[in-house]
């Protein structure tokens, strides 16, 4: 779906960064990229060798058109001509670095895009509360997909007015939710 945005960015001679929440997702994404473009993107994560990392950094600093797919640390890389950042599964808590220097890679991607005058796409089937709030504040724009990627049946959703359905003093969930949870446990 967003491979078209990457393609358009490459045609213009620009660099793209695709952030993924887990290292394990890079291989699947690389295969998808290869199937679409006929070549592999640069891959960045902690398991790459120093030689591989040095080669990638030289390429990024040259400004040559390329696509880098990586885990959260890739947002810290020096791009010379970055014009597109895609943060896939933006809601995922794996984007938060809890040890060492603490940072939220999704938020850094947004800031990096602003500094680079790049487009930043936050992709998620279930956006984070922060992104929904920013959308409500008109800081972000939400684009809804008309077609699902995997054509799965969407779950039914029922909104329970907690003013009408007072929970018991021992719990904070409504009686309807509690009763349904007993059925599905």
Segments from the language model and where they lie:
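Walker A/P-loop NTP-binding motif
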Residues: 2-12
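Conserved Walker A/P-loop ATP-binding site and its immediately adjacent core
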Residues: 15-31
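Conserved helix-turn-beta segment of the N-terminal RecA-like "Helicase ATP-binding" lobe
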Residues: 28-49
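Conserved motor-coupling elements within RecA-like helicase/translocase cores
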Residues: 47-68
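Conserved RecA-like ASCE ATPase "motif II neighborhood" in helicase/translocase motors
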Residues: 70-79
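Walker B catalytic acidic pair
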Residues: 72, 88-90
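Post-DEXD/H (motif II) to motif III coupling segment of the RecA-like Helicase ATP-binding lobe
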Residues: 92-152
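Conserved interdomain linker/interface between the two RecA-like ATPase lobes of SF2 helicase motors
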Residues: 131-132, 139-182
